[in-house]
Amino acid sequence: MYMAMTSSKPLNVVRSFYSVAQNFVDRPLVICDIDHTLFRCSKPLHHYTEFLQKLYSERYRFPVNVEEEALNLMHRAYCDGFIQQTDPAGFRHMVERIEELGGRIVFLTARNIYSHARTLEDFRKVGFEHPETFDIHYTNNVITKGDYIKCMQLDSGFDHVYFIDDQHGYLESVQRECPHIHCFQFQYKY
């Protein structure tokens, strides 16, 4: 874990849910992002880059921004369901710690509420049983996560709240609107 600076206070950058769980105290509430935090594309970016470089070098002779195309291809694959968990063992450990300490986990995503069925299917795809029992909140990408937590009072009844996301902007919004929440920027490694 290392610290990155935001406009207000240091931000904890982690590569595993183990690092987050080390900070838990009595009755933690964990608010966890889904896309690119809990789930990631099943193939790394270099897979798509190498594929496109080979394809373009063998079949096409025109200039193309391979890195941009690879990123688009990876995003399409992710949206089509080629996903896996970023850190299965670390996430299991974190959930066990939450349960040991009498806490709770909720998921907060920028996805649209109309994608709820797909979200549940994505959870099943990566190995979660009974995702219909999960507490999943959707911002519909129309409100920041900090504003959502504050407006919906997601942190109500908990003294120790932890927020995990991969997007710096969402983390800053939580720090701004809910300064008592401990924020962790998740950066998975292939």
Which sequence ranges carry the predicted segments?
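Structural recognition of the beta-strand scaffold that forms the well-ordered cores
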Residues: 30-32, 79, 105-109, 135-137, ...
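Acidic, Mg2+-coordinating phosphoryl-transfer loop and its flanking beta/alpha structural elements
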Residues: 158-190
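Receiver (REC) domain active-site loop signature in two-component systems and cognate sites
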Residues: 36
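A short, conserved beta-to-alpha structural element at the edge of catalytic cores
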Residues: 56-69, 181-190
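Short, acidic loop-to-helix structural element flanking the phosphoryl-transfer center
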Residues: 58, 64-106, 113-120, 143-148
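A short, structured active-site edge motif that brings together acidic residues
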Residues: 110, 120, 125-145
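Glycine-rich phosphate-binding loop signature in dinucleotide/nucleotide-binding domains
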Residues: 24-26, 101, 153-159
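Non-catalytic pre-domain segments flanking phosphatase-related domains
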Residues: 1-32, 41-53
